[in-house]
Curated annotation (Swiss-Prot):
GO terms for biological process: glycine biosynthetic process from serine; tetrahydrofolate interconversion. It comes from the Bacteria. One of its GO terms (cellular component) is cytosol. It is an enzyme of class 2 (transferase). Its EC number is 2.1.2.1. Its cofactor is pyridoxal 5'-phosphate. This is Serine hydroxymethyltransferase 2. It catalyses: (6R)-5,10-methylene-5,6,7,8-tetrahydrofolate + glycine + H2O = (6S)-5,6,7,8-tetrahydrofolate + L-serine. The lineage of its organism: Bacteria, Pseudomonadati, Pseudomonadota, Gammaproteobacteria, Pseudomonadales. It is found in: Cytoplasm. The record marks 228 as: Plays an important role in substrate specificity. Catalyzes the reversible interconversion of serine and glycine with tetrahydrofolate (THF) serving as the one-carbon carrier. This reaction serves as the major source of one-carbon groups required for the biosynthesis of purines, thymidylate, methionine, and other important biomolecules. Also exhibits THF-independent aldolase activity toward beta-hydroxyamino acids, producing glycine and aldehydes, via a retro-aldol mechanism. The modification N6-(pyridoxal phosphate)lysine is found at residue 229. It comes from Pseudomonas fluorescens (strain Pf0-1).
Amino acid sequence: MFSRDLTIAKYDADLFAAMEQEAQRQEEHIELIASENYTSPAVMEAQGSVLTNKYAEGYPGKRYYGGCEYVDVVEQLAIDRAKELFGADYANVQPHAGSQANAAVYLALLSAGDTILGMSLAHGGHLTHGASVSSSGKLYNAIQYGIDANGLIDYDEVERLAVEHKPKMIVAGFSAYSQILDFPRFRAIADKVGAYLFVDMAHVAGLVAAGVYPNPVPFADVVTTTTHKTLRGPRGGLILAKANADIEKKLNSAVFPGAQGGPLEHVIAAKAICFKEALQPEFKAYQQQVVKNAQAMAGVFIERGFDVVSGGTENHLFLLSLIKQEISGKDADAALGKAFITVNKNSVPNDPRSPFVTSGLRFGTPAVTTRGFKEAECKELAGWICDILADLNNEAVIDAVREKVKAICKKLPVYGA
């Protein structure tokens, strides 16, 4: 028998110390990684619940194990809320991650060797959209499109490549693109060549849910997303689609038993909470602020003479090119880290440096907005970053910024009393 008094602190001091240090880091550091956010205590409570004990292969009402009557309720809540949130007819909440959701889509609708057309990783796409190092680039004939000299997707190029290569699937989505995707144009191109249109909205799902970014569900054959990032839920994946019995059956079979075994019902419960939170009016205000904050930060960098890829942002993120400053993303990342500002180095279009070094930084505002930053704080923060980038080796500047960061983090904590 387990005692409910047996806590991590009492049982595993080493692990607990690392967890406490991470909690302190999250409170004292400013988080600007575009794919990161903070979940609510309710989401974390679900992930630490007794639901972690239950195995439930299959789907609600069609399980391979007994004792699933209550996890069926949990999973159906998540399904129904996801469908309501995104206006979808179909939702699969079982994918363990966004990459696994994407792999399931490929497994469902493609055969090995089929041609896919996706955004180049070097131009802002994602590994799972056909990058050569990913299974999506190894199992399928991956053709890549990119951005033009203005930092915008060249839809004429997308259409030309589609006509030339006749892909079975066109992938629309990104990990580092700051503008609005033209889903009707993608749909028209896909229809022209008889391809599936698959949209990976992992980065903007929260914005879509709040109505501040176009919803791809009406245009795509299938849509995937993560449930963290802007959606602010647990780490996990989600597949959505319009009503299509054939595609729905293929997707369900691809997730289970095709790509996964038993679902993580404790994570699915956390997804259900996340979707409920995203259905509230305050979530829309949050997402509107996320975009305002990103635009405020990008504006400061432009004023200070830095190059923002695509000239600005219409979502939660933007890329800063440091080619002109002859600074590597790796060095900039390290210097900002000393000041308790967490970012990630990122390749930029036509980057002369390797992906391990890069010439850019990616910034995102979901996490700082969660802790209460508005435009004023974000402009101030961008100014501090510019001060450091102007002289990476100036320890006095780094020390001064770190103290400012600690002060504003204390003023705007992630988790209040």
